[in-house]
Amino acid sequence: MYILPEELRAELKRPLGELHRSFSDVDVGNSFLITVGDVTTRNALEHGLKPDVSIIDNRIQRRDSDHEFRDTATILRSRNPPGTVTESLWKSIEEAIEGATERGERFMIVVDGEEDLAVLPSILLAPPDTVILYGQPDEGVVLVRASETSSKAEELMKKFEEA
């Protein structure tokens, strides 16, 4: 398990990619698509996007979410306490990406705990042409290109404490 050190919290509150104020401004083209977060995943689906992998925790800004996802993606379940990246989450992301790239299946990972930090392993495990979308609370949606951000994600993960 990787534990987020206190000194990284402020850095991770800044967007890792392009911040878009409106979801309508987001253009993912034909890229492999990963969405992280309930609101981001819901917005993607409402805008006609079909994420190859989506990661949710049924919570929005630390409160239980009451919306249902009407999606045909295969469901995977993972445990991941707040402020961590667990082996369970890492393996679920790996399994989902593998299934999506090799078999063309779509996956939704439902996290028991918190999915906020799933962006980092998603960047590191994703194929180079991947776009990752995640929410920036009260600001918009962040578009991250895995190929442009993988070295930054690796640098950040190296600063996590291993437990």
From Swiss-Prot:
One Gene Ontology MF term: GTP binding
Enzyme Commission numbers on file: 2.7.1.237
Pathway note: Cofactor biosynthesis; coenzyme A biosynthesis
Binding site for GTP: D38, V39, D57, E115, D138
GO biological process terms held by the UniProt record: coenzyme A biosynthetic process
Keywords attached to this entry: Coenzyme A biosynthesis, GTP-binding, Kinase, Nucleotide-binding, Transferase
A Pfam family recorded for this sequence: DUF359
Coiled coil: none
Catalysed conversion reaction: 3'-dephospho-CoA + GTP = GDP + CoA + H(+)
InterPro entries (UniProt xref): GTP-dep_dephospho-CoA_kin
Family: Belongs to the GTP-dependent DPCK family.
Function: Catalyzes the GTP-dependent phosphorylation of the 3'-hydroxyl group of dephosphocoenzyme A to form coenzyme A (CoA).
Name recorded for this polypeptide: GTP-dependent dephospho-CoA kinase
Lineage, highest ranks first: Archaea, Methanobacteriati, Methanobacteriota, Methanomada group, Methanobacteria
